Amino acid sequence: MEREKSNILSRRLESIIFMFLIGLISVLLNFTFSQNSFAEYKATLSASVNEDTAAIDGTEVIESSSETTEHAINLKVKTTNKTGYTATLSTKTDETALLNTNPAITTKISSISSVSSLSNLPANTWGYSFNTNADFNPIPALSAPANLIHTTEKSISEENHTIKLGLKLNSSLKPGNYENKLIISVVSNPYTPKAVMTEGPDFNSKLESLETTTDKIEHFKKSTVAPTASMNAMNIEDEDSDYEIKLWLDPADKTAYYYVETEKVYLNEDSSQMFLSGFDGQKIENILELDLSNFDTSKVTDMGGMFRDMRNLTTLNLSSFDTSQVTDMGGMFADMRNLTTLDISSFDTSQVTNTALMFADIYNLTALDLSNFNTSKVTDMSYMFSNMSNLTTLDLSNFNTSKVTSMSAMFTLSYYDELDDKLETIYVNNDFNTTNLTYLYGMFGNRKKLRGGAGSFLTDPSTADKTWLRIDDPANGRPGYFTRKP
């Protein structure tokens, strides 16, 4: 009797085929773009699936021991779009069930309602999984597509992804074809073309090359008009820039101009040594004015030596600088000998690891606000304030030195500047954390006017060891060169 029942069931279901009509890949280039004369940004996006229609024999599924099956669809995507792409999945309409093509038959294969493993799918339901995810998700409707993948950069090579359709069936289904259509949409992410500056050392080399024995640069700023051919402008954009950036010198007003079609210029990740005048002091040492207001520094990681040796600049406005990604500020302002005003109170230094020589040899600076400095990741503070002879006080109350390994010559003064020394007080909130401090040679060399909060000092300050990096408390046998901030 059981065999006869099985034969009847087999005949009834032999014509049940489940059709999955996979919709055409929707390939859309969705990025903003304005025409320019340099290099039109052309993003490409290709996407394909290995089949347009997935057919599954329902009889085989029902007669299997698990009454389940999986069907894999391979999705291939590649894009040159710099912000990547987004792939979504949905049905063509808000109907998520597989419906019998005979409208008189009302049985259907419904979407699962919650995440489930294949073996735990309810009878006569289906779902999908993506790539390595073992569990199956409810089939998404047109009004609420599922986000399969979202990338943020261009493809290095063709990407391969797998969409699996999982079903669980039983004999209660009526014979016939059950269908639905899935839409896989692959869309490039929005992208706005950008002007990106060349690397700092290359910019510096090109800026220096503008000068001659008679024509010197005294100003640097953006031009509102493009250069003419007679100006012999040179290109200073990065190879990944979507716009051309031109640089030239106008000898009449002694100004180095740059021009770009966009309002903003993104500085290179490596913006080190951009305005370095050179250790020989022969190039771009006469600059008196820098207009950096159109520079976006949000992607910069290296500002080491960025303004080093700019000996004639007296003020520097960096209020527009975003330093949230910067790790290297070593020697950033070193040897700016005539600088009298430096406002870096807006700096975010939370990622900085190197501040060595950052303010070294700024002889004429009388005040330095470091109240917002976050030094929690800094490892090298050597020579950080060396030869700053005109500071009378230094407020380091916000300093965290727990990771610092080197403070060699951190506050030192050269023998030649000893008579000009004015530093008397260093304010802190707590003793310096010297747990990881290894290099500390000559930290306070020649700082003979410096006193701790209770008057402690050494006849030869260069002999101070790391125990002097604390709040002065001689009454308890703890002399130090620091004063507790009021």
Where are these regions (language model features)?
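N-terminal secretory signal peptides that target proteins for export/translocation
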Residues: M1-L13
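Generic detector of N-terminal low-structure segments
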Residues: F20, F33-Q35, L413, R484
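C-terminal segment of classical bacterial N-terminal signal peptides
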Residues: L24-N36
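Negatively charged
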Residues: Y191-P486
